Amino acid sequence: MSSAQFDHVTVIKKSNVYFGGLCISHTVQFEDGTKKTLGVILPTEQPLTFETHVPERMEIISGECRVKIADSTESELFRAGQSFYVPGNSLFKIETDEVLDYVCHLEG
């Protein structure tokens, strides 16, 4: 499990809002130039589809979600403390019945 906080970072004040406010995140920039987003996904009635441009590792901080990566036909369940990886130039579908906190590690 990763640390509960990030030190020595810059946080972009303007939020990233997706799907009418069902997903809201903030970009965090590190001294070495890497970026992550810290976000929340509210309960969904249907899966939310996100496209990736760079590889991403989604770390679940609290809650649980069902995820389909790329063309997968099966959903996989992820809970707090777990992560899933999505290749660059791909997509994933995510749904949750509860508030989901996450860190998206942009790895490209």
From Swiss-Prot:
Coiled coil: none
Keyword Transferase belongs to the record: yes
Keywords: Glycosyltransferase, Transferase
Keyword Glycosyltransferase: yes
TM annotation in the entry: none
EC id: 2.4.2.1, 2.4.2.2
Span of the signal peptide: none
Reactions catalysed according to its record: a purine D-ribonucleoside + phosphate = a purine nucleobase + alpha-D-ribose 1-phosphate; adenosine + phosphate = alpha-D-ribose 1-phosphate + adenine; cytidine + phosphate = cytosine + alpha-D-ribose 1-phosphate; guanosine + phosphate = alpha-D-ribose 1-phosphate + guanine
Pfam hit, one: Ppnp
A cellular-component GO term for this protein: cytosol
GO MF annotations, alphabetized: guanosine phosphorylase activity; purine-nucleoside phosphorylase activity; thymidine phosphorylase activity; uridine phosphorylase activity
EC top class named in words: transferase
PANTHER family, per the entry: PYRIMIDINE/PURINE NUCLEOSIDE PHOSPHORYLASE, PYRIMIDINE_PURINE NUCLEOSIDE PHOSPHORYLASE
Protein purpose: Catalyzes the phosphorolysis of diverse nucleosides, yielding D-ribose 1-phosphate and the respective free bases. Can use uridine, adenosine, guanosine, cytidine, thymidine, inosine and xanthosine as substrates. Also catalyzes the reverse reactions.
Protein's recorded name: Pyrimidine/purine nucleoside phosphorylase
Species lineage: Bacteria, Pseudomonadati, Pseudomonadota, Gammaproteobacteria, Moraxellales
